[in-house]
Every structure is written in C-alpha cells, then in structure tokens.
Regions:
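TPR-repeat structural position
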Residues: 19, 53, 87, 121, ...
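Phosphate-binding active sites in nucleotide-utilizing proteins
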Residues: 286-356
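Structural marker of alpha-solenoid helical repeat scaffolds
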Residues: 32, 66, 100, 134-141, ...
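Conserved alpha-helical positions within TPR/SEL1-like repeat arrays
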Residues: 11, 38-49, 72-83, 106-117, ...
C-alpha cells in the first residue's frame, strides 16, 4: 500500500472519530517521515478530538516548525490554545492567519467563537458576518457549512439581545434547511406559544414533523427537538405533552451517557474535604474594592432572572456565565485534574497575589 492510500485511511478514521486509530497509524508513518507537517497536523487533530490538548499543541508546533505557513495547523493550534484558556495566544494566531489569508473562513469562525467565549458578542457578530459574506461568493458550498455559520451568527445576536436580527437569521436558516433542529429550538426560545397565535401553533406542527423525520440514533437532534417541543407545550399549559417530550429528552440523554450518582457524591465529599480546616476569612489577601456577586442555583430555577433583576441596578454589571474563575482555579490550584489543598493554603498566606 502506498503512502497516499495510508493517509486516506487515516483521514477516514479522523472523519468517523476513530482518533486512537489515527494516532497509532500516524506514529508509524512519522517514524519514517518525522517532518511531514500534514501527518503532524492530523495527529494533532486526533489528540484534539480526545481533549489531549497538550499533546495536540506539541504536534501543531512541530508541523509549524517545518512549515511555518501551514494555516490549517496554525488554526488548529489556536483552537487547542483556546481550549486550555490561553486566549491571548489563540487570538494572536487567528489574527496572523487572517493577515496571511483574509479569506480563511475557518479562522473567522473560530476567532468568532473565541469572542463569544469572552462575551464579546458584537465582535463575534462582525466575524461571523465576514465569514458568511465570503461563503456567499463561493460555489458548491455545502448547505451544512452555510447554516452552521448562520446559526452561530443567530446565537451571537441572541446573546447580544438583538432579537429581530436573531429571528431574521433563523428564518434564513430554515429557508435553506427546514429541518434544522438548532434553528427550531432557537425559535422556540424566542417566542411564547399561545393557542391564539397561529404562527406559534404552526411552528409546533413543523417541529413535530421534524421530530418524526429524525432517526432515534441521531441522539443530539432528537434530544434538542424534544426539549423544544416540551417547552412549547409547557407554554400552552399542556403539561401532559410537555412532560412526555421533556421526559423523552432526559431518557435519551440518560441512555447515552448514563449516570453515576456515587461518583457525584464522592466528588462533592472530596470538595468539602479539601476546604476542611481552611479559614477563608483568615487570609493575607488584600480586600478588593470591587464587590463580586455570585448567583448559584439549579438549572431552570430562576438564576438568569435573578441576575437580570440584580444587574438592573445602576452600579451592577451582569457579566453572565464567565470562564475566568474556572481558568484561575485550573491554573493555580489544580494538578493532574485534582485540586491540591496545599496550593490553596500557600496562596492564602501570600500578602499580594496576581493570579491571572
């Protein structure tokens, strides 16, 4: 079997998410061709698929060492850096890609995803719009690519509370793909279903038709359309049907992922144990002038509404679900995916701390 055939096999494994097969096969070929940037890139993508981002970063850096203008490797490196919280480095790479090739759609899309991650929705919107404007001028672009970018744009508009723009984009998506589950679910989140509103009742019928068309094996779509239908019937106060669809969605998720209550209990006990004997008030850390309000609660328990009410005060800014606390905790107190109690104690005893 020649090299081209072997690489095609690896590409096929990558497409169907057989990431370990890709890594195993690439290692054999890289022993013979250690500087092949294409092989290094797909190996990095396989590690990326397994969330082994440190390994993926090594592969992408090796690819770029031998081929500095390999934009695919550069884009993938930016994605892995983004995944581990190195947002500035990721941002610089996306911008560098777009300087080299201003029409590189993946970079626009991924850079926009980064903007969304840090709640810069206006910045994300501009990047998604630019990606879409490029695609509009291209021939033979798969509908899934077009609707994918449009859906990201619609979600960014919604996050920026630009409802009319969101609805306009969703209509465009459904004109291309009437069965687009994400667009139907997003539509459902924007409207209040009512027996007196013909459009909303029509939308329920459309979603029920989409539900019939989806194979039960297509788990994510089935779950999303079931949640959307559950919400619509909840609005109509038809709780029997609402429960049917919500229960169906939950059962599908459970069947796929399962649940380990004992593991959850153990994780909670470990968190409590870590902080036993640590007096958080007895610290050398200088108090901050800025006061931070955390709003915690179970899903669908009213935390979003509570945040909106509190944020309506002139001296309060509602920041939404931020990633920064998670990044700081990960960087300073976690080793090998576990919190280290001694690190927390050491940090508490410092007089001044710069941890970002």
């Amino acid at each position: 079997m020649d090299l081209v055939e072997k690489i095609k096999i690896l590409q096929n494994h990558l497409k169907v998410r057989n990431f370990k097969k890709v890594i195993e096969g690439s290692k054999v070929l890289l022993n013979k061709m250690p500087n092949n940037d294409y092989l290094l890139n797909i190996t990095g993508m396989a590690y990326q698929g397994l969330s082994q981002h440190d390994n993926s970063i090594k592969c992408f850096n090796r690819a770029l060492k031998h081929s500095p203008n390999n934009l695919a490797a550069m884009n993938n490196l930016a994605n892995s850096l983004k995944a581990i919280g190195k947002l500035e480095e990721s941002k610089d790479l996306y911008e560098n890609i777009l300087k080299i090739n201003p029409n590189y759609i993946n970079a626009y899309n991924n850079y926009a995803n980064l903007k969304t991650l840090v709640n810069d929705y206006d910045g994300a919107i501009q990047l998604y719009k630019k990606a879409y404007s490029i695609i509009e001028k291209m021939d033979n672009v798969p509908n899934s690519t077009v609707t994918g970018i449009l859906f990201s744009l619609a979600a960014a508009y919604q996050s920026a509370n630009k409802i009319e723009e969101t609805q306009e984009i969703v209509k465009k998506i459904l004109s291309i793909d009437p069965s687009h589950v994400g667009a139907h679910k997003l539509t459902g989140s924007l409207i209040k279903y009512s027996n007196d509103n013909e459009e909303s009742m029509k939308h329920i019928k459309e979603m029920e038709e989409v539900d019939k068309q989806i194979n039960d094996q297509d788990l994510l779509k089935k779950v999303d359309i079931s949640y959307a239908l559950g919400k619509s019937y909840e609005d109509l106060k038809n709780y029997e049907k609402a429960f049917h669809y919500l229960s169906k969605a939950n059962q599908l998720k459970f069947d796929k992922k399962g649940s380990n209550l004992e593991a959850e209990k153990k994780a909670i006990r470990n968190i409590i144990k870590i902080f036993e004997g640590i007096d958080l008030k007895n610290s050398n850390i200088e108090p901050q002038e800025k006061k931070i309000i955390f709003i915690l609660g179970m899903p669908r328990s009213g935390t979003t509404l509570t945040e909106q009410i509190v944020a309506s005060h002139s001296e309060v800014y509602g920041a939404g679900e931020l990633i920064y606390l998670q990044q700081v905790l990960k960087k300073n107190f976690v080793n090998d995916s576990k919190y280290e109690k001694q690190r927390i104690i050491d940090f508490q005893n410092l007089s001044k701390n710069i941890i970002f």
